C-alpha cells in the first residue's frame, strides 16, 4: 500500500466518524424532547453517549498512531474500522428511546470490546518482545499498552447499555446487583484505568507543565469517589453521591480542557499548526483527554440511577 493510500485511508476514517457524529445530532436533539420510558433507558442512553465519545477517541487515535507505524501489521487496520462501527452503534443507541436491546448494536459493541482486549494483548507482546522485556523504557517507547483499553471501555459501556434496556423499569439488575451500583463501579474502574495510562505518559513527559498533574490526581479521585458512592451504606449515600457528582463534573470538564492543552502542545512545537502533518504525530495525542469526559458523564448517569435504589 502506497503512502498516499495510507493517508487517504486515515483521513477518510476520521472524516467518516466526524460526519457520523454531526449527522446524529439531529436525532439526539429530538430524543431529548420526548420523555424516556424509564430512568434505566435514560441511563442506557447516557452510557451510549459515553461509548460514542470513547469510540471517536479510539478512531482518531488508532488511525493516526497506526498510520505512523505504517500499518506494518495488517491487523492494525482493524481498530479504526471496529471503532467506526462502535461509534455508529453507540450514536444509534443514544438516539433510541425504546426499552429493548438492539441485537446488531449489542453484537458490534461486544466485538469492539473483544478487539480492544486483543489489541491490549498485542501491545503488551510488542513491549515484552523488545530487548529488556517489561521495562520502563519499553513501556514508554513501545506500543502504548493502555491505548486499546479505551476500545474495551467503549464496547463495555455500549454492551451494558443494551443489556440494561432489557431490564424492568423498576429495580433493574446488572451482574446480580442493582443496576445503578453496577454502572457506577464499571465507570469508576474505567476512570482509574485511564488515569493510570495518563500517569505513565505524563511521567514520560517529566510533567513539564503543572497541568500535567491534573489527570493523575483529579481523575483517580473521581473514580474512587464514584466507587465509594456505589458501595456506601444508606445513611451516607446522599452525601457520598453529592460529593462524587461534583467531582465528576470537574472530571468531565478536565477532559475537554485537556484537549485544549494538547492542542496548545501541538501549536508550541516547531512550525506549530502550519506543520500539522508532523506535529500531530510528534505532539501530545489530541484524542486522549476526552476519554475522561466520556467516563465521567457515564458515572453521572450511574449516580442518577443509584439515587432511585435507596
Tell where the protein language model's regions lie, with residue ranges:
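Short amphipathic, positively biased membrane-proximal segments
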Residues: 1-310
Amino acid at each position: 500500500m502506497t503512502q498516499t493510500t495510507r493517508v487517504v485511508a486515515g483521513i477518510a476514517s476520521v472524516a467518516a466518524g466526524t460526519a457520523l457524529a454531526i449527522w446524529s445530532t439531529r436525532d439526539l436533539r429530538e430524543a431529548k424532547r420526548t420523555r424516556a420510558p424509564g430512568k434505566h433507558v435514560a441511563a442506557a442512553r447516557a452510557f451510549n453517549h459515553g461509548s460514542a465519545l470513547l469510540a471517536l477517541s479510539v478512531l482518531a487515535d488508532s488511525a493516526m498512531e497506526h498510520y505512523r507505524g505504517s500499518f506494518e501489521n495488517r491487523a492494525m487496520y482493524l481498530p479504526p474500522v471496529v471503532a467506526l462501527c462502535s461509534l455508529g452503534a453507540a450514536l444509534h443507541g443514544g438516539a433510541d428511546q425504546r426499552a429493548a436491546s438492539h441485537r446488531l448494536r449489542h453484537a458490534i459493541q461486544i466485538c469492539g470490546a473483544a478487539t480492544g482486549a486483543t489489541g491490549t494483548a498485542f501491545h503488551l507482546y510488542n513491549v515484552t518482545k523488545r530487548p529488556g522485556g517489561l521495562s520502563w523504557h519499553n513501556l514508554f517507547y513501545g506500543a502504548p499498552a493502555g491505548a486499546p483499553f479505551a476500545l474495551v471501555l467503549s464496547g463495555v459501556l455500549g454492551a451494558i447499555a443494551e443489556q440494561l434496556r432489557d431490564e424492568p423499569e423498576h429495580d433493574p439488575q446488572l451482574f446480580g446487583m442493582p443496576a445503578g451500583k453496577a454502572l457506577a463501579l464499571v465507570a469508576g474502574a474505567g476512570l482509574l484505568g485511564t488515569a493510570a495510562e495518563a500517569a505513565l505518559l505524563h511521567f514520560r513527559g517529566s510533567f513539564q507543565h503543572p497541568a500535567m498533574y491534573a489527570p493523575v490526581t483529579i481523575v483517580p479521585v473521581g473514580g474512587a469517589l464514584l466507587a465509594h458512592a456505589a458501595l456506601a451504606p444508606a445513611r451516607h449515600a446522599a452525601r457520598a453521591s453529592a460529593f462524587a457528582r461534583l467531582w465528576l463534573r470537574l472530571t468531565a470538564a478536565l477532559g475537554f480542557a485537556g484537549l485544549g492543552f494538547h492542542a496548545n502542545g501541538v501549536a508550541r512545537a516547531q512550525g506549530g499548526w502550519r506543520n500539522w502533518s508532523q506535529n500531530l504525530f510528534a505532539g501530545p495525542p489530541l484524542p486522549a483527554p476526552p476519554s475522561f469526559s466520556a467516563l465521567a458523564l457515564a458515572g453521572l448517569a450511574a449516580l442518577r440511577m443509584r439515587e432511585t435504589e435507596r
